[in-house]
A protein has these predicted regions:
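Extreme N-terminal starter segment of soluble prokaryotic enzymes
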Residues: 1-5
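N-terminal Rossmann NAD(P)H-binding glycine-rich loop of SDR-like oxidoreductase domains
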Residues: 6-19
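A structural preference for long, well-packed, hydrophobic secondary-structure segments
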Residues: 10, 44-45, 82
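Conserved Rossmann-like nucleotide-cofactor binding loop
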Residues: 12, 38, 65
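NAD(P)-binding Rossmann-fold cofactor-contacting core
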Residues: 20-43
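Short amphipathic alpha-helix with an adjacent loop that forms part of the alpha/beta core around
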Residues: 46-56
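N-terminal Rossmann-like NAD(P) cofactor-binding module of classical short-chain dehydrogenase/reductase
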Residues: 59-60
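Beta-strand-loop-alpha-helix segment that lines the small-molecule cofactor/substrate pocket
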Residues: 64, 69-83
């Protein structure tokens, strides 16, 4: 099973991807990143990508464009691919 971090998890597309992943046995969202957390996700949500310490195979990005620099810095440091 692929373990993914959902970057931008509380946006419209982040929620669509989270719901699709919940119904798919081949992928698991293990953490979310979003500055706004209303507590409705089935996984922990962090306000900053740098707060996340959960191992993952991939980061799925549907966050705002302004978040891309921190995302890519984190992904390079952790050697995690981003899609």
């Amino acid at each position: 099973m692929v373990k993914a971090i959902m970057h931008g998890c509380n946006g419209k597309m982040g929620q669509v991807i989270s719901n699709l992943a919940a119904a798919d046995s081949d992928i698991e969202i293990v953490a979310g990143i979003d500055p706004h957390d209303d507590g409705h996700n089935a996984y922990p949500v962090y306000r900053s990508i740098f707060e996340c310490d959960i191992p993952a195979d991939v980061i799925i990005d549907f966050a705002a464009a302004g978040a891309v620099n921190n995302l890519l810095d984190y992904a390079v440091r952790k050697n995690i691919p981003v899609v």
